[in-house]
């Protein structure tokens, strides 16, 4: 049986995480969490250990003081990868978690920045993730900068955007040019479709390709071990996703 759209996203996230030693995942992030769990399972088969810190999970989180420890650990350089989203994301990697329109009269209002600015500055591999891929989300310029994708020359910064994964495509971020580069397009979509649904300009990789399907072994891991582990923090997501197989 072929992979569902969400299973393909989980496999894509795991691929983006290849090479990390410690990945942290914030709240309300089932697909990034599943991708991190898949990365751990795949690396274990290669004899390599990956540490996970899944906020909201009792079994897959070594923090005892929640987000306070997350920020301390990140500031000490002990987290290799983290995920951020945004109500708006622009072509320079800036994210808006506050609201649309002129602040402080933004409408709608979103949950808030929650320390995203710090994590964006210090975590080397920040992966931006949004299932929705539309001009409403991917705008030319965000209305409010919760966390800046780039900094001025001379500003010491160890972290920043590394990749963008959406329901339609995968991009990498070119920090030197401050632009996203389209590297993969998910099946049943094309380049024109991506351009129509993206409100900012982007480059295309020379080796632009269709997102590969997860192989049988990877798909079995997702549907077995990964979903079993994910159910600790996201039981409803697992039930719904397994029901669509």
Where are these regions (language model features)?
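N-terminal active-site beta-alpha-beta segment that forms phosphate/nucleotide-binding
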Residues: 1-67, 78
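Intrinsically disordered, low-complexity segments enriched in small residues
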Residues: 3-24, 160-178, 201-245
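Charged/polar, solvent-exposed surface patches and flexible loops
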Residues: 15, 37, 72, 196, ...
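Short amphipathic alpha-helical patches
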Residues: 36-40, 59, 97-98, 217-222
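Short, surface-exposed, charge-dense and proline/glycine-enriched linear segments
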Residues: 54-60, 114-118, 233-245
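Conserved phosphate- and dinucleotide-binding cores of soluble alpha/beta proteins
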Residues: 59-215
């Amino acid at each position: 049986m072929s992979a569902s759209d969400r299973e393909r996203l989980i496999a894509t996230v795991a691929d983006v995480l290849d090479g990390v030693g410690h990945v942290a995942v914030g709240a309300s992030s089932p697909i990034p969490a599943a991708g991190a769990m898949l990365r751990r399972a795949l690396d274990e088969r290669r004899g390599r250990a990956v540490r996970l810190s899944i906020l909201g999970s009792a079994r897959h989180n070594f923090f005892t003081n929640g987000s306070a420890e997350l920020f301390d650990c990140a500031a000490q350089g002990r987290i290799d990868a983290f995920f951020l989203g945004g109500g708006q994301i622009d072509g320079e990697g800036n994210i808006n978690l506050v609201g649309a329109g002129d602040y402080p009269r933004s409408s709608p209002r979103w949950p808030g920045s929650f320390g995203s600015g710090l994590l964006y500055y210090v975590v080397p591999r920040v992966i931006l993730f949004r299932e929705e891929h539309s001009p409403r989300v991917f705008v030319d310029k965000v209305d409010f900068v919760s966390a800046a994708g780039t900094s001025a020359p001379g500003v010491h910064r160890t972290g920043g955007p590394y990749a963008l994964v959406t329901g339609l495509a995968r991009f990498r971020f070119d920090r030197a040019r401050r632009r996203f580069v389209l590297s993969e397009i998910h099946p049943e979509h094309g380049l024109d479709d991506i351009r129509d649904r993206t409100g900012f300009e982007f480059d295309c990789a020379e080796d632009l390709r269709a997102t590969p399907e997860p192989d049988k072994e990877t798909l079995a891991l997702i549907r077995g071990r990964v979903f079993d582990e994910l159910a600790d923090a996201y039981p409803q997501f697992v039930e719904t996703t397994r029901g669509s197989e």
